[in-house]
Amino acid sequence: DKKLAEHFVVVSAKTDQAAKAGVVADNSFQIWPWVGGRYSIASAMSLAPTLAFGFDVFTEFLAGMRSVDQQLQNTTPENNATLILGLVDVLNFATGRYSSQAILPYSSALRLLPNYLQQLIMESNGKSVRQDGSDSEISTSPVIWGGVGTNSQHAFMQMLHQGTQAVPSEFIGFAKISN
């Protein structure tokens, strides 16, 4: 039993429970209670993908997150793409003008990005109650949907291009393609 417990790795908010179950303390990674779902990707929750892709890839991922944070904090508003995109989203959806947003990556490597952003944005922002418990007076989240642009050209892209309703759409392309 003890030998078996040495081969388990646990990621949990309740590491004390893992210890009671016999998991070696060095094999237990805590999820802090203040880490919300949208940020868990930068926490111990990413242990499985880190092991699958390597620590170097995870370190690069964290460095990318840090560079976006620094760009947001250190760039003037008129040159700040992150801030501008965020403000456009607020104007589009908080005003109730639009109810959905399409995410259209032009790379099959990013085929799951719309699904990830759907979970991230709609779970995080799709609430009718504010942090203080009061009701929100504005629309809180668009319906996020999309797919790889080249695969969608004869499906919903037809509606986006020739339909009667406007849908804010983010097209994601690359200056360099890596295979």
Give residue spans per PLM region.
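Active-site phosphate/pyrophosphate-binding segments
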Residues: 2-179
